């Protein structure tokens, strides 16, 4: 989020109990209304998350689709059907991700709009999106954490124009 913010994205972090979005799936209620007053020039609102946080973001957006313009999924998939929505969806994961269940990722890919922007970071891993150190079961990254974050930010920034 820090790197996106450096690229003129307003990033709002909603704190979750235990850092797990699944423990408060409605924590984002009222966030847009609150920040529209602070940032009246913002015209597009996106939600995003990493791993389970991404899955929970997708669930939330599916229930509030009229409030959002898009969704960012980092090493995550959506079990909620967003395929007929007008959302701009960005899905980013690493080629060395050992945590993301790729069978489920492929299975649920049909829940996203056909024009979803998808990017596989060559050498990227699951843990680097969370910046919390390597997670048990993750693959061995072939890129540095900073490189992976930079590639993800560049992809989003370029395709958000």
PLM segments and residue spans:
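C-terminal catalytic histidine-bearing segment of alpha/beta-hydrolase fold enzymes
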Residues: 117-161
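Conserved alpha/beta-hydrolase
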Residues: 2-23
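Short beta-strand immediately N-terminal to the catalytic nucleophile in serine-hydrolase-like folds
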Residues: 44-49, 74
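A conserved short beta-strand
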Residues: 66-78, 88-90
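Gly/Ala-rich beta-loop-alpha elbow adjacent to hydrolase catalytic centers
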Residues: 48-57
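Short beta-strand/loop motif that positions the catalytic acidic residue
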Residues: 85, 91-93, 97
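Conserved acidic catalytic loop of the alpha/beta-hydrolase fold
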Residues: 27-45
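Short alpha-helix in the alpha/beta-hydrolase fold that links the catalytic acid
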Residues: 100-111
């Amino acid at each position: 989020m820090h790197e996106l913010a450096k690229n003129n994205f307003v990033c709002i972090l909603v704190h979750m109990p235990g850092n797990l979005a699944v423990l408060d799936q409605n924590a984002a209620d009222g966030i847009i209304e609150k920040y529209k007053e602070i940032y009246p020039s913002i015209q597009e609102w996106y939600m995003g998350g990493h791993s389970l946080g991404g899955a929970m973001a997708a669930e939330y957006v599916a229930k509030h689709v009229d409030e959002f313009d898009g969704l960012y999924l980092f090493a995550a998939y959506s079990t909620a059907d967003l395929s007929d929505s007008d959302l701009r969806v960005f899905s980013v994961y690493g080629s060395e991700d050992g945590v993301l269940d790729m069978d489920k990722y492929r299975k649920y890919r049909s829940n996203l709009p056909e024009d979803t922007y998808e990017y596989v970071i060559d050498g990227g891993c699951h843990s680097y999106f969370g910046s919390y150190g390597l997670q048990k079961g993750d693959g061995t990254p072939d890129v540095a954490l900073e490189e992976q974050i930079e590639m993800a930010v560049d992809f989003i920034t370029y395709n958000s124009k």
